[in-house]
Structures are given as structure tokens and as C-alpha cells.
Amino acid sequence: MALSLDDLPEKPAPAEPVSAPVGRRVQASLVFARGGGTTVLSRQVVPYPFHITRAFRMHPESPDLATLYLQSASGGLYAADHLTLDIAARPGARVHVTTQAGTVVHRGGPEPTRQDTRLAIAADAFLALNPDPLILFPGAHLAVSTDITAEPGARAIVTESVACHDPLGQDRPFDRLDLGLTIRTPEGRALVRERSRIDGAAFVGPDSPMGGHRAYGTMVVLGAPEDARLAGPLLRQASDTAGCLTGVSVLPNGAGLGLRLLAPDGGTLSAGMEAVFRIVFEALSGCGPGRRRK
């Protein structure tokens, strides 16, 4: 026991409170418009850690269709981050936004890591947003929110996917995953609203609602035309052939189509998502997606 100069026991110093991690609060914005007979990125606000490439022209048969890669310059999402991405497709714009690789979600804390995506799609516009999977590391606590506002006549493909990975190979689970989707009219009327939550232990446990699958993906198709290629059995067959378990359903209020895919791992999920995406992309845009180097 430590003694003070007057031979009395010293009082222990009060413990310093443990503060929760403070994450980044960042908002990026992309606006695509029709100009000069093609699609141009008319406005961009891309602060760190967001990074984008220039718009590529990868469709010789549809030179007005732009492709843009969205990248992370920081190595993923970290504890208590709150990143927001706004994308607007103005009338007549046709754009495909993708990523260069999957995004790692690192160990979190009590406050979730948040990723919000807000899309505004005008009439006669086409937007395809299909990022690579979010990769949940052990202890990751992630909340994902996607909000889509679509005018009548808008066409869109929006995908979202998650997979688990333990760098030590010990099958340690993530902490928690929250997913939210809202599709609304320009007047604010909600057409679709979904919310889901699952703990990592339940995700990988013996009674998991995922069964033995460890990767999950969704696809929303808005403004889908009457096209035989979009029939549920054909889409399921394309994805199932890649090793996924696939469900296709009509969204409420005539909003479009909804697809859900389960897979044993992220690689299989990506293959199944890509197989379905190619079919839907061609049906909505009139051309197949360009080959994207990653």
C-alpha cells in the first residue's frame, strides 16, 4: 500500500471514464445529368474517405451510358463512422455506379458504424448501383440504410450484399447488422419500407435463419419493363447456377421487383449477383454491362 508524506494511505486516483470511439461524419454527393447527347457528372462533392474515378464509356452501343467507380481511400469502415452518399440521376441520365472491391467493416463499439445511401432518380433516368459486398470482420457493428426516391418512369437497379470474414480463421462473428430500405415517391409516400436486424452469433449459430449460408444479398429493380428475361424462374436459375439460393418477388405498391440471395461465401454470392445483374441490366438499359476491371 502506498503512503503519503503524512504516513496516511494515499487515495487511489479516480478511474478515467472510457470514452466511446468517435467516428468520421462525412457526406458525399454525385449528380448525373444529360448534356451534349451523353451522361455527365455535373456536380461532385467527394471528401475523404470517398474517392471516385472519372466517368468511363464502356458501352460502344450505348455511348451515353456512363460508368463510375466509387472507392474508399481509408481501408474500409471503422468504429462509429457515419458515411452518407447521395446520388441523383437527372432526367435522361444513364449511369452505372460500382466499386473496385469489397468494403471491410472493422470492429465496432456500442455506437454502430453507419452507411447511408440516398438516391433520387428522375423520370426517364436510369441508375444502376451495384457495389461489391460489405465484408464484416469480427465485432463489426453495422447499420445500413438505403433511401430511394423515384419519379414515375425512372429505372433503377440497386444491390446490397454482406459477407463475413475472420482474418484469423477462427469463425469469430460480427456483432450486429441492421438493414433498412425505403422506396418513396417524390411526394414522400412510402411504397416499400423494410427493416431487419440480426446479431452475429445468431447469424452463424446452429439455429441461424440463414441455415448454413454465410453471405446475403438483395437487389431492387425499379421500372422493370414487361420482359420475359425478368421472369422469376429465369432469374432464379441464373443465380442458382452460380451456387446461390434465390428468391424473387413483386414489391408492394407496384414498386418493382425484389430479389434475395443466400450463398455459402462472398465469392459465390458475388457470382450469383453478377449473373442476375447482367440480365436485369440488359433488360432495363438495352445493352449488357461493360466488362469492368477490378
From Swiss-Prot:
Residues in the signal sequence: none
UniProt keyword annotations, A-Z: Chaperone, Cytoplasm, Nickel insertion
GO molecular function: nickel cation binding
Gene Ontology annotations for the cellular component aspect, listed alphabetically: cytoplasm
Residues covered by region (Disordered): 1-20
Subcellular location: Cytoplasm
Superkingdom of origin: Bacteria
A UniProt-annotated Pfam family: UreD
Subunit organization: UreD, UreF and UreG form a complex that acts as a GTP-hydrolysis-dependent molecular chaperone, activating the urease apoprotein by helping to assemble the nickel containing metallocenter of UreC. The UreE protein probably delivers the nickel.
Family, as annotated: Belongs to the UreD family.
Function: Required for maturation of urease via the functional incorporation of the urease nickel metallocenter.
HAMAP family associated with the record: UreD (MF_01384)
Protein known as: Urease accessory protein UreD 1
Native source species: Methylorubrum populi (strain ATCC BAA-705 / NCIMB 13946 / BJ001) (Methylobacterium populi)
Source species taxonomy: Bacteria, Pseudomonadati, Pseudomonadota, Alphaproteobacteria, Hyphomicrobiales
